[in-house]
Amino acid sequence: MTGEGPDSADPLSEALAGLRIVDLTRLLPGPLATLRLAQWGADVLKVEDPGEGDGARTLWRTEAEAEAGEPGAFYRRLNAGKRVLRLDLRSDAGKATLLDELRGADALVEGFRPGVMARLGLGFEAVSAHNPKLVMVSISGYGQHGPWAQRAGHDINYIAMAGLLEQVASGGGEIALPNFQVGDLLGGSQAALSALLAALLAARRTGRGCHLDISMAHEVLRHQVVVRTALEALGRVPPAGCDLLSGGAPCYGVYRTADGRHLAVGALELKFWQGVCATLGRPQWERRHWSLGEAPGSEPAMALRAELQAVLATQPLAHWVQVFDTVDACVTPVLRLDEALRHPLFAG
């Protein structure tokens, strides 16, 4: 799939044709999940309140768009291919219209704070009474139940609580907030999407829908496979920047070049590391690999990392890109987004 709306070149563009989705979500997690459904051929009806509507409308909006009262690119990107209906769900008329839509729908996706749908008279029991096959997906920060259910939060809070943010730090301990919303996108969008598709298959087989409780914080924690395994094996959480995949192994890390840019070395397997060593003329490094006993984060490993950094700091990024271009060693430049969009890998 290459486009951001339904794509005729995508073999999945009609995979969900005939599926009807009602989307009450706003901002990023829910709208991205339902965007994927629309891209795969589902009929997605986005319901917004008659006032300001989805807050995403005003994010990253140009002055011209604001003056014209038009939504910005962020909203348009997340809601391409969807129909939009303005409803006041606090009014009897608005609720009646929504329930009419739900009678013929396959799924309802919502992202209100837990309890809001029930207070509106639109909880799972109420909507399933009108459509027993309906799958309802509720996306929230901390789940529909439990002591944290009513707490507000955003992506930064979900990844902080799930132990992910603590790992996104340099050796000096400074945390770098990623400009990729892991909690929203993995814990919210992708988790909701995969669970919804499974629930739709079950509903078609059994004739009964279900209510899916998607907690973004819990989903991020559930996906902490690498660090959690390290914790179980070592009895402790590896310090940030010192684990096998976070910078503790010289063969797998990010290195600064002479021009202040960075090179990503992903030579995780021994054969790739040997390719790096041969290319740099450092055969003495070949046996210094985690698979041969040099523990990630150990003093010898960090010393070798410093040696490799010193070598890569002698030349600008373009030099190393050219050097490693034909070497099978998993070495790539760290690109800015504008560079990535122009790169032949993505531009074609």
Regions found by a protein language model. Give the residues of each.
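Glycine-rich beta-alpha junction loops
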Residues: G51, G141-G143, M216-L221, D259-R261, ...
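A glycine-rich dinucleotide-binding beta-alpha-beta segment and adjacent secondary-structure elements
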Residues: T326-G348
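Aromatic-enriched alpha-helical interface/lid elements that frame and gate functional surfaces
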Residues: C251-V331
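Conserved Rossmann-fold dehydrogenase catalytic segment
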Residues: Q144, G173-V182, R204-V220, R236, ...
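Oxidoreductase and adenylate-handling cofactor-binding alpha/beta cores
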Residues: A162, G188-G209, V226-L234, G275-Q284
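NAD(P)-dependent dehydrogenases' Rossmann-like dinucleotide-binding region
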Residues: L164, G188-A191, L212-L221, L268
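Short Pro/Gly-enriched beta-strand edge/turn motifs at strand-loop
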Residues: R57-T62, A233-A240
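N-terminal helix-loop segment corresponding to the beta1-alpha1 unit
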Residues: M1-L200, R204-R205
